[in-house]
């Protein structure tokens, strides 16, 4: 990972597709705590490093939400994995947030943090950093309290299904915005599956709503404990093309390389991308 939440939404899906079946099987060995140690503890979790991917991701999100152009009432985080950092800036702008993941072990990790239970991963360094870059005078405790209050549900998801959240109607749809960090490329065996997964999640978004994607560039594998998980390597232009095909306008696309000192042997990621896209109206 590159700070990459790829545990997120590994679908079991269609049994007739051996590639997707292999992805689902591999993710049964996913270890959330190993993943968090690899990517959110130092050195990658050292947010004081100016060229680190952690500060870059948080800055992209904070600057996007600071524009006021990405807002509404409902937001769905697609494939949350065991992480919450991707919502620290979003929670000031959306009062109803749904977190999702394919794996129960990741959903349990999220519940530990939301309930402030013993043994929960400590995200306070990330919360402090977001408060610093937002510059609103908010304490990190207030930031975390707001996020906990605004996450209304944690649901199973399978991005390889045409209805990723199923037909139960447990989340208010369509959502005003979607966030997805290090999910689609990590659970898709090839670019065609990546495109279909993007098409599927976009059905959850209202026309005119925004989709924020963070992901890994040119990565083929990463480690999460005993699990060595395959990733479909994507380039920035392929992400752009996929967004165009799924009837969204890609307004912002940025990238940053993975610094050499953060190439720690837990993946082969080359860089990180951030995109902001808007679903077209009337298509």
Swiss-Prot record:
SUPFAM superfamilies listed in its UniProt record: S-adenosyl-L-methionine-dependent methyltransferases (SSF53335)
pH dependence: Optimum pH is 7.9.
Keywords for this protein: Catecholamine biosynthesis, Methyltransferase, Phosphoprotein, S-adenosyl-L-methionine, Transferase
UniProt PTM: The N-terminus is blocked.
UniProt-listed PROSITE patterns: NNMT_PNMT_TEMT, SAM_MT_NNMT_PNMT_TEMT
Taxonomy, superkingdom: Eukaryota
Modified residues annotated as Phosphoserine in this record: 7
BP term (GO), one: methylation
Any one Gene Ontology molecular-function term assigned to this protein's record: phenylethanolamine N-methyltransferase activity
Tissue specificity annotation: Expressed in the adrenal medulla.
Pathway: Catecholamine biosynthesis; (R)-adrenaline biosynthesis; (R)-adrenaline from (R)-noradrenaline: step 1/1
Pfam families in the record: NNMT_PNMT_TEMT
Activity regulation (UniProt): Inhibited by p-hydroxymercuribenzoate and p-chloromercuriphenylsulfonate.
Reaction equation(s) it catalyzes: phenylethanolamine + S-adenosyl-L-methionine = N-methylphenylethanolamine + S-adenosyl-L-homocysteine + H(+); (R)-noradrenaline + S-adenosyl-L-methionine = (R)-adrenaline + S-adenosyl-L-homocysteine + H(+); (R)-normetanephrine + S-adenosyl-L-methionine = (R)-metanephrine + S-adenosyl-L-homocysteine + H(+); (R)-octopamine + S-adenosyl-L-methionine = (R)-synephrine + S-adenosyl-L-homocysteine + H(+)
E.C. no: 2.1.1.28
Binding site for S-adenosyl-L-methionine: 35, 40, 79-80, 85, 101, 106, 158-159, 181
Annotated Gene Ontology cellular component terms: cytosol
Binding site for octopamine: 219, 267
Record's function text: Catalyzes the transmethylation of nonepinephrine (noradrenaline) to form epinephrine (adrenaline), using S-adenosyl-L-methionine as the methyl donor. Other substrates include phenylethanolamine and octopamine. Also methylates normetanephrine.
Family from the record: Belongs to the class I-like SAM-binding methyltransferase superfamily. NNMT/PNMT/TEMT family.
Entries under NCBIfam families matching the protein: GntF_guanitoxin
The name this protein goes by in its record: Phenylethanolamine N-methyltransferase
Gene: PNMT
């Amino acid at each position: 990972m590159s700070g990459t939440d790829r545990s997120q939404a590994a679908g079991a899906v269609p049994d007739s597709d051996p590639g997707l079946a292999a992805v689902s099987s591999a993710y049964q060995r996913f270890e959330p705590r190993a993943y968090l140690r690899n990517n959110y503890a130092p050195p990658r979790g050292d947010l004081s490093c100016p060229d680190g991917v952690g500060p870059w991701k948080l800055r992209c999100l904070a600057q996007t939400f600071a524009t006021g152009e990405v807002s509404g009432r409902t937001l769905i985080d697609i494939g949350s994995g065991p992480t919450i950092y991707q919502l620290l800036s979003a929670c000031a702008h959306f009062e109803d947030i749904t977190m999702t993941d394919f794996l129960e072990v990741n959903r349990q990790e999220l519940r530990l943090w939301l309930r402030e239970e013993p043994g929960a991963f400590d995200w306070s360094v990330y919360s402090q950093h977001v408060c610093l870059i937002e510059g609103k005078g908010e304490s990190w405790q207030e930031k975390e309290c707001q996020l906990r209050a605004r996450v209304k549900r944690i649901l199973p998801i399978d991005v390889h299904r045409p209805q990723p959240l199923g037909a139960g109607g447990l989340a208010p749809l369509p959502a005003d915005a979607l966030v997805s960090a290090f999910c689609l490329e990590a659970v898709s065996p090839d670019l065609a599956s990546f495109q279909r997964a993007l098409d599927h999640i976009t059905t959850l978004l209202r026309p005119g709503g925004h989709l924020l994607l963070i992901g890994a560039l040119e990565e083929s594998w990463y480690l999460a404990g005993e699990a060595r998980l395959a990733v479909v390597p994507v380039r920035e232009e392929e992400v752009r093309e996929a967004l165009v095909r799924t009837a969204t306008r890609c307004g912002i696309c940025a990238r940053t390389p993975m610094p050499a000192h953060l190439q720690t042997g837990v993946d082969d990621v080359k860089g990180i991308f951030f995109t902001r896209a808007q679903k077209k109206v009337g298509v």
